[in-house]
């Protein structure tokens, strides 16, 4: 049986919010079967819980934010991407502010935290969502789609007219597995352009961003001294974001995601369209040991080896 997983131990971290620039305390805790990923604002009295659910997305302005009334938790996508990558089904995410800390701008620090906490198999089958019929959403020339597929595949194309971003590094595809995620996707950092800095400042955005936690480009080149972690790091980060956004379905996907210039808003629109068309998907479990699992999850302790 492919089982649900939670954390073995409680683990804590501290970081800075991408948009707020505030210091944030983060605590990841185990949760019972069928809990899902629940975000808990511990700085409020009483505390407020917000489930990691596509229907709870309230804002997608340069990050995905979950909302309940006027309470929100923003920039959830990198942590959710790590949860999806390692196959964590159930966890409580306690946070001391309205934003998950940015860490180094990738999902890698969250992968390390989850690996350090350890994963524990639970006595219940893991539920997947299998795409049965194609679903597509468009916005101008942008699109995002889900199609039936035997595993979980992601294909993404960006379109930046920039000297440092060649045509050959604007598209990528991955067949998802824990190993692929950790080695090929998790280290890709968020990025921004100097020309957008004024807009960010005027709108109180990206106050926590710097070259320690983001790729920064001027009109000609990458400004970070160490350069890029992958030649196509920008499009890989878009895949990382998409994995996190898609995990707001509450379950791992069996299907193929394709996107052109998509972002958090279009990803969420895609999930809502899928959920609305109930004939386009189904829940599946793998209880028979003889069944081949469509997605390969590796015990996190051995992933980095």
Curated annotation (Swiss-Prot):
Q: Name one GO biological process term.
A: lipid A biosynthetic process
Q: Which Pfam families match?
A: LpxC
Per UniProt, Zn(2+) binds at 78, 237, 241
What positions constitute the catalytic site?
264 (proton donor)
> Per its Swiss-Prot or TrEMBL entry, what cofactor is needed?
Zn(2+)
The pathway this protein participates in, as annotated, is: Glycolipid biosynthesis; lipid IV(A) biosynthesis; lipid IV(A) from (3R)-3-hydroxytetradecanoyl-[acyl-carrier-protein] and UDP-N-acetyl-alpha-D-glucosamine: step 2/6
The source's domain of life comes to Bacteria
Instruction: Give, as one word, the top-level EC class.
Output: hydrolase
Which cellular component appears as one GO term in the record?
membrane
Q: Which GO terms label this protein's molecular function in UniProt?
A: metal ion binding; UDP-3-O-acyl-N-acetylglucosamine deacetylase activity
Query: From which residue to which does the signal peptide run?
Result: none
| Reactions it catalyzes | a UDP-3-O-[(3R)-3-hydroxyacyl]-N-acetyl-alpha-D-glucosamine + H2O = a UDP-3-O-[(3R)-3-hydroxyacyl]-alpha-D-glucosamine + acetate
Similarity comment text for this entry: Belongs to the LpxC family.
Protein role? Catalyzes the hydrolysis of UDP-3-O-myristoyl-N-acetylglucosamine to form UDP-3-O-myristoylglucosamine and acetate, the committed step in lipid A biosynthesis.
Q: What is this protein called?
A: UDP-3-O-acyl-N-acetylglucosamine deacetylase
What lineage is this protein's organism placed in? Bacteria, Pseudomonadati, Pseudomonadota, Gammaproteobacteria, Oceanospirillales
């Amino acid at each position: 049986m492919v089982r649900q997983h939670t954390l073995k131990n409680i683990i804590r971290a501290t970081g800075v919010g991408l948009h707020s620039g505030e210091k944030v305390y983060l605590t990841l805790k185990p949760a019972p079967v069928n809990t899902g990923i629940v975000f808990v604002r511990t700085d409020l009295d009483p505390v407020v819980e917000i489930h990691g659910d596509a229907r709870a997305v309230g804002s997608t302005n340069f990050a995905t934010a979950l909302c309940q009334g006027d309470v929100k938790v923003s920039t959830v996508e990198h942590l959710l991407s790590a949860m999806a990558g390692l196959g964590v089904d159930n966890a409580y995410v306690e946070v001391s502010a309205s934003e998950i800390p940015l860490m180094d701008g990738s999902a890698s620090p969250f992968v390390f935290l989850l690996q350090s906490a350890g994963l524990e198999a639970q006595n219940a089958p893991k539920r997947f969502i299998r795409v049965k019929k194609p679903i597509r959403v468009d916005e101008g020339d942008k699109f995002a789609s889900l199609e039936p597929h035997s595993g979980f595949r992601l294909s993404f194309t960006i379109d930046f007219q920039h000297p440092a971003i060649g045509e050959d590094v604007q598209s990528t595809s991955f067949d998802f597995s824990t190993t692929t995620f950790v080695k090929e996707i998790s280290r890709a950092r968020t990025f921004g352009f100097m020309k957008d800095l004024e807009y960010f400042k005027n709108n109180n955005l990206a106050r926590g961003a710097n070259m320690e936690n983001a790729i920064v480009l001027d009109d000609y080149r990458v400004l970070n001294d160490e350069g890029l972690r992958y030649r196509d790091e920008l499009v890989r980060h878009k895949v990382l974001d998409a994995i996190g956004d898609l995990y707001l379905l509450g379950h791992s996907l069996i299907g193929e995601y394709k996107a052109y210039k998509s972002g958090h808003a279009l990803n969420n629109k895609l999930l809502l369209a899928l959920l609305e068309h109930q004939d386009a998907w189904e829940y599946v479990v793998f209880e028979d040991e003889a069944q081949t699992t469509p997605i390969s999850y590796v015990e996190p302790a051995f992933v980095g080896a």
